[in-house]
Amino acid sequence: MHFVSYSLCYDVRSNIMEQPIYFYEPDENHGFLANFYPCSITVSGTCWPSSEHYYQAQKFDDVRLQEKVLRAEDAAQAFRLSREYQQWQRHDWYDIRVEVMRFIVREKFLQNTPLAHQLLATGDTELKEHSHKDAFWGDGGDGHGRNELGRILMMVREELQEHAPYNLVQFIDSAKLPTQWGTFQMYGFIEKATGKEHLALVYGDIEQQAAPLIRLHSECLTGDALFSARCDCGFQLAKALQNIVAEGAGVLLYLRQEGRGIGLINKIRAYHLQDDGADTVEANEQLGFGADMRDYAFCRGILSFLGIERVRLMTNNPRKVKALQLANIEVTERVPLQEGNNPHNHQYLRTKADKLGHMFDRNFVKP
């Protein structure tokens, strides 16, 4: 699926006056907003190829005509068939058509999670169907139209904004990320509760995986970028990316939760205390923090955006498994990620096992 960039929409925070988002053709920018956009929607056990198919079929009481519209090869043909059978249109159609449209547009986004996230990524920008042929559903081409479809889309957007997983993160943009192991697609998100920026690195076709291999990796500047041997983070990051490429598809979430959530400067303070003899948990507590301040609930929003409900999770940390389960993500398997044991971090790993419950093989971390 193609995801539209909304980096400009996010600039609303800097008081930039935004132009409306115009949509019409399904294969153009913002085409997912159009009724002609192909996406499956199930209503009472029947799968409709698009919201346009459903809307046009409801013009008729005759189930045989509804069936013909349902079987139309695309939305354009569904529209043409409704015109062809117009003489059999139900007498109260103009009284109920807005209600029908509201229903099917709402179902379109409720049943297609990636589209719902795309809709939310438009922020508060006005949405307009830019149709010069339709001054009821569209803007009439020159702005004089009622734009009823745009109004419905904005109503659905407002509703989604109030509920998880849609209120957890906002998708901003995506780009390719070539690495020494392979090329990933990098997606950027803003966590709505904190304003923190997080990444999803996606490799391969995750839609073909019943439960993609994933990793929740908390940012560690010292380990990931400065090659520190005090922890196992950098080693785990490299191995996780390698494992995903070897698998053929998978996701690494790079989470801005430096120092188990206490931040970079406080991590340096904690390192100082460790230099003086404290272990990693004691150092955090001496600074007034909990042993682990990280929160993973918002990850549900990112995984939802990617269409992921079941995962195989690379981790040694049972807390991550539990956090995803509490977020209604099924963890079908925990995949150990035991990397980087060395003389500089052996006691750190031992403390993670003894005090934080991390699961290591005996031959990896010895007493």
Curated annotation (Swiss-Prot):
Functional pathway: Cofactor biosynthesis; riboflavin biosynthesis; 5-amino-6-(D-ribitylamino)uracil from GTP: step 1/4
UniProt cofactor note: Binds 1 zinc ion per subunit.
Residues binding GTP: R215, L216, H217, S218, E219, Q236, E258, G259, R260, T280, T315, K320
Names of the cofactor(s): Zn(2+)
Active site: D292 (proton acceptor), R294 (nucleophile)
One Pfam family this sequence matches: GTP_cyclohydro2
Gene Ontology CC entries for this record: cytosol
Residue positions binding Zn(2+): C220, C231, C233
Keywords, alphabetical: Glycosidase, GTP-binding, Hydrolase, Metal-binding, Multifunctional enzyme, Nucleotide-binding, Riboflavin biosynthesis, Zinc
GO biological process: carbohydrate derivative metabolic process; riboflavin biosynthetic process
GO MF term (any one): hydrolase activity, hydrolyzing N-glycosyl compounds
Catalytic activity: 2,5-diamino-6-hydroxy-4-(5-phosphoribosylamino)-pyrimidine + H2O = 2,5,6-triamino-4-hydroxypyrimidine + D-ribose 5-phosphate; 5-amino-6-(5-phospho-D-ribosylamino)uracil + H2O = 5,6-diaminouracil + D-ribose 5-phosphate; GTP + 4 H2O = 2,5-diamino-6-hydroxy-4-(5-phosphoribosylamino)-pyrimidine + formate + 2 phosphate + 3 H(+)
EC number: 3.2.2.-, 3.5.4.25
Record bears the keyword GTP-binding: yes
InterPro entries: GTP_cyclohydro_II (IPR032677), NADAR (IPR012816), RibA (IPR000926), RibA-like_sf (IPR036144), YbiA-like_sf (IPR037238)
Family the entry assigns: In the N-terminal section; belongs to the YbiA family. In the C-terminal section; belongs to the GTP cyclohydrolase II family.
Name of this protein: Riboflavin biosynthesis protein VVA0006
Species for this entry: Vibrio vulnificus (strain YJ016)
